[in-house]
Amino acid sequence: MLDMGDRKEVKMIPKSSFSINSLMPEAVQNDNHPQPHHHHHHQQQPQHLQLPQQHHLQPHHRPLQEEDELDKSLLEVKTESLPPGKGDPAASELPGEDKDKIDDKKVDGKDGDSGKDGGDKKNGKYEKPPFSYNALIMMAIRQSPEKRLTLNGIYEFIMKNFPYYRENKQGWQNSIRHNLSLNKCFVKVPRHYDDPGKGNYWMLDPSSDDVFIGGTTGKLRRRSTTSRAKLAFKRGARLTSTGLTFMDRAGSLYWPMSPFLSLHHPRASSTLSYNGTTSAYPSQPMPYSSVLTQNSLGNNHSFSTSNGLSVDRLVNGEIPYATHHLTAAALAASVPCGLPVPCSGTYSLNPCSVNLLAGQTGYFFPHVPHPSITSQSSTSMAARAASSSTSPQAPSTLPCESLRPALPSFTTGLSGGLSDYFTHQNQGSSSNSLIH
């Protein structure tokens, strides 16, 4: 209460005692220190706290000192409330070079990570790449050396090349699995039992060769019809070349028959070649029984059709598969290799093809020699045996007695039709040394 009364008495003092000379020392101090810093303000605060002590010591100068210190305290409050760039005189007096240095430090301190990551990282996070999940899968499979990848291999490729998916591992892996199973461009290939590891492989479907990744949308797109036709033409030429080699390899695995002569002749129509002549294929398939009956081998070398096993039945496919091939081998064994087979029309059977067919009989009859006879008027089988011994492609000839006990044991495991064929040949043609 005493303080309030003292303050009221101070306000009631007449202002006639106020003089300009009392303000002169403060003006001089302001000229010496035109812009005080924060440190001076902090040093003047204890003087503001000592006002009650000076109030009792110097009663005549109380109003002047109190008003000046109140103004200074108001200035301090205003400067502290304002941001440092505007109200702080120390900050406003910084030269332009210092401001540039401060800005550079801020960029290097916080935003400098974006320069290290190639501009993909903004505000501490990577941007999502503008590619669909199908495009990411296709990129991963196409860059692999074997053009196939497992599911983990696809994950590793995406996380290695796109850091966004390395930081955000939730959700996108399920999307990758769904796109692999739903999109027809991707085919699942089972792992081979010799291949170590887990999981199936994923490959691109051959029909997806014309699929590319759009540059603007990042989605899969197909090429136009013209470019697609060119790709189909190239793909067809490639498949035909590989298909021929595959059929050649497959044919050598199942049946060592020469591809130049087949029992089932292709039913191709007669076409003109480039020089205007007709092709070697007839318009109607010619049965091989007629081919064999046109040669002049004699009655001993002609096949009988009364024994139930004729060449017509061979061609028509009425004989089982194993009997068919074995009979074909026996058929070739009984035909002289060097014999030309004349045929009517434009169809002619090359003797080389007959030689190739006869050479295949070693597959079933390894002990049977392959004769090489050039004369059609040969009458004795001894001359044939002598000529076959001089043939370069025939193996070493064995005596006829060594062949006789081997044939019954071989024919016992054959079907009824072929065994009848061998017994008929043994009974009917006694001069044929190839069978008995």
Curated annotation (Swiss-Prot):
Q: What top-level branch of life does the organism fall under? A: Eukaryota
Tell me one Pfam family matched here. Answer: Forkhead
As recorded in UniProt, coiled-coil segments are none
List, as start-end ranges, the regions of compositional bias called Low complexity: 44-56, 375-397
Per UniProt, the ranges with Basic and acidic residues bias are 1-12, 96-128
Which CDD domains does this entry report, sorted A to Z? FH_FOXG (cd20021)
Q: Which residues bind DNA?
A: 128-222
Q: In which tissues is it expressed?
A: At late gastrula and early neurula stages, expressed in a narrow stripe at the anterior end of the neural plate. At later stages, this stripe of expression thickens and expression also appears in the lateral margin of the neural plate. The anterior line differentiates to show expression in the forebrain, anterior (nasal) retina and olfactory placode, whereas the lateral cells form neural crest cells that migrate in the first branchial arch. In tailbud stages and tadpoles, expressed primarily in the neuroepithelial cells of the telencephalon.
Listed A to Z, the keywords are: Activator, Developmental protein, Differentiation, DNA-binding, Neurogenesis, Nucleus, Repressor, Transcription, Transcription regulation
A GO BP term here is: positive regulation of neurogenesis
Which cysteines are disulphide-bonded?
Answer: none
Query: What's in the GO CC field?
Result: nucleus
Q: Name one GO molecular function term.
A: DNA-binding transcription factor activity
- List locations, semicolon-separated: Nucleus
Locate the region Disordered.
1-63, 79-129, 375-402
What function does the entry list?
A neural-specific transcription factor that can act as both a transcriptional activator and a transcriptional repressor. Both represses and activates neuronal differentiation in a dose-dependent manner, independently regulating cell fate choice and cell proliferation. Converts ectoderm to a neural fate. Suppresses the transcription of the cell cycle inhibitor p27xic1 and promotes the proliferation of neuroectodermal cells at a high concentration. Promotes the transcription of p27xic1 and inhibits ectodermal proliferation at low concentrations.
Q: Which protein, by its recorded name, is this? A: Forkhead box protein G1
